[in-house]
Swiss-Prot record:
Pfam families registered for this protein in UniProt: Ribosomal_L34e
Chief location bin: cytoplasm
Name of the gene: rpl34
Quaternary organization: Component of the large ribosomal subunit.
Family according to the record: Belongs to the eukaryotic ribosomal protein eL34 family.
Chain's role: Component of the large ribosomal subunit. The ribosome is a large ribonucleoprotein complex responsible for the synthesis of proteins in the cell.
Keywords, in A-Z order: Cytoplasm, Endoplasmic reticulum, Ribonucleoprotein, Ribosomal protein
Name this polypeptide is given: Large ribosomal subunit protein eL34
One Gene Ontology molecular-function label: structural constituent of ribosome
Annotated Gene Ontology cellular component terms: cytosolic large ribosomal subunit; endoplasmic reticulum
Localization (cell): Cytoplasm, Cytosol; Cytoplasm; Endoplasmic reticulum
GO biological process terms on file: translation
Coiled-coil region: none
Species per Swiss-Prot/TrEMBL record: Danio rerio (Zebrafish)
Length: 117
């Protein structure tokens, strides 16, 4: 005859926090083992990229708090909050803006010298 299984905790409904898996004990009994909820790795802070960040552990918030810093970020500018593609774009944009400022300054200086002559 098949062995009947009962939950080990008081909650008797099939909810997200009450998920179980079967496990065979050394005494050859089959019992329920409660599974932990799976975590998700963070999304990019830019809000444009659809995927999740690579190189960061996908764990629940309580576990994330206990992890060391090396497991919560990657060693790059904005590592752990922005994806590499967005960081690359941001650096390029900042460089081009700075270049544009320099060009404007040079043009102003040339116009000033033209005026003084």
């Amino acid at each position: 005859m098949v062995q009947r299984l009962t939950y080990r905790r008081r909650l008797s409904y099939n909810t997200a926090s009450n998920k179980t898996r079967l496990s065979r004990t050394p005494g050859n009994r089959i019992v329920y083992l409660y599974t932990k909820k799976t975590g998700k790795s963070p999304k990019s802070a830019c809000g444009i990229c659809p995927g999740r960040l690579r190189g960061i552990r996908a764990v629940r918030p309580q576990v994330l708090m206990r992890l060391s810093k090396t497991k919560k970020h990657v060693s790059r500018a904005y590592g752990g909050s922005m994806c590499a593609k967005c960081v690359r774009d941001r650096i390029k944009r900042a460089f081009l803006i700075e270049e544009q400022k320099i060009v404007v300054k040079v043009l102003k200086a040339q116009a000033q010298t033209q005026k003084s002559k």
